[in-house]
A protein has these predicted regions:
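Alpha-helical transmembrane segments
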Residues: 1-28, 58-93, 127-133, 140-142, ...
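Membrane-interface loops
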Residues: 24-41
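Juxtamembrane helix-capping/reentrant segments at transmembrane boundaries
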Residues: 37-51, 106-119
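Hydrophobic alpha-helical hairpins/lids featuring a short glycine-rich hinge
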Residues: 77-112, 116-117
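Membrane interface segments of multi-pass transport proteins and intramembrane proteases
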Residues: 104-112, 144-153, 283
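Internal, non-catalytic "lid/hinge" segments that mediate substrate recognition, gating
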Residues: 111-112, 119, 124-137
Length: 338
């Protein structure tokens, strides 16, 4: 089983790296350049025109892994990786539409927030019922990490909870994609956590482990082109795909609450944005952070007095995520009597 996950990682890394070799020049040739927000850090304007939609390279890599290494899982009747892939692809498609609108308008304004939320909610509810149909999710109970207990919950309440968590996760992960290499470096430890858990819990979770390991490998290949200074951005095509993948894995393993610790940096990013907007409105113009989300606050020298380099921010986010992934591992270690 471990060898299959390693193989999934290696194949995804290789495919992502090779696809990127051809994709980046192609995106430059068709002028698929990113428009930078004018209200962002001023030095980010130097990134104007950097190719976007680079997430296509790790999306292709994960698809190859699911149809190659995941083939044995399908032969044994395990389709978890395909459900997660399909769900992530739906969100990737929403992101692609958003990127397309931005490129067409030549400004950083794609789909309206309302349209994106409605599409995300529809996808979330459909996914939950599909996973329930194939036995991956129980809509009448909720697992509590660290306490190692499952508490009863009504089906309507679970669906509302699931929709909230999925849409919240999607938009939190998306906020993290604001510095070269940040979203990919923060999400890799999350996916490695799910891959390791599948080894611990046995063959039942092999297909999900293949998917998680494939994402981690694909992201490493993507970082060849996305690490500072980035030659390409993943765009909403890639970031929303990742958002969907992380949310799908949490629910497919039937432990969505693990995202409270495992996704700590996503939560910090989202909370910083919510606090900033709320405080700004309540105080008629005052701010808690120099700029939100939190990674921009660090870039602007908030609290510390010196401006953080992009590589330092990436190291901080990835390091904290690794620590909380270990903590999360402790929180679910005994779930299946390990």
């Amino acid at each position: 089983m471990t060898l299959k996950l390693i193989l999934a990682f290696v194949i995804a890394f290789a495919v992502s790296a090779v696809v990127g070799f051809f994709l980046v020049p192609y995106l430059k040739r068709i002028k698929a350049g990113q428009s930078i927000k004018e209200n962002g850090p001023t030095w980010h304007m130097s990134k104007q025109g950097t190719p976007t939609m680079g997430g296509l390279m790790f999306i292709a890599a994960i698809a190859v892994v699911c149809l190659s290494v995941g083939f044995e899982c399908m032969a044994e009747g395990e389709y978890g990786h395909l459900f997660c892939l399909a769900f992530a692809l739906v969100f990737g498609a929403i992101g692609f539409l958003d990127d397309y609108e931005k490129l067409k308008k030549k400004q950083n304004l794609g789909l309206t927030a309302g349209k994106k939320i409605l599409l995300q909610l529809a996808a979330a509810v459909a996914f939950i019922f599909l996973m329930r149909r194939f036995g991956y999710v129980a809509l009448d109970s909720l697992y509590i990490p660290f306490w190692n207990k499952t508490v009863p919950i009504s089906e309507p309440l679970y669906v509302i909870f699931a929709a909230f968590v999925i849409v919240g996760t999607v938009n939190s992960v998306n906020l993290t994609d604001g510095v070269d290499g940040l979203a990919a470096s923060t999400t890799m430890p999350v996916c490695i956590f799910f891959a390791v858990i599948s080894i611990l819990w046995g063959e039942r979770f092999l297909s999900l482990g293949v998917f998680a390991s494939g994402i981690a490998g694909g992201l490493l290949g993507f970082l060849i082109y996305n690490f500072h200074p980035a030659k390409v951005f993943m765009g909403d095509t890639g970031s929303l795909f990742l958002c969907g993948a992380v949310a799908a894995l949490a629910f497919a393993y039937d432990m969505p609450l693990i995202l409270v610790t495992l996704g700590i940096m996503y939560i910090i990013e989202a909370l910083s944005d919510i606090i900033q907007v709320g405080y700004f409105k309540l105080t008629h113009g005052k701010r808690v952070f120099k700029m939100s989300p939190f990674h921009h606050h660090l870039e602007m020298g908030g609290w510390t007095g010196h401006k953080w380099k992009e590589t330092q921010i990436v190291a901080l986010f990835a390091g904290v995520t690794v620590l909380f992934a270990v903590l999360s591992f402790i929180g679910v270690f005994h779930r299946f009597g390990v």
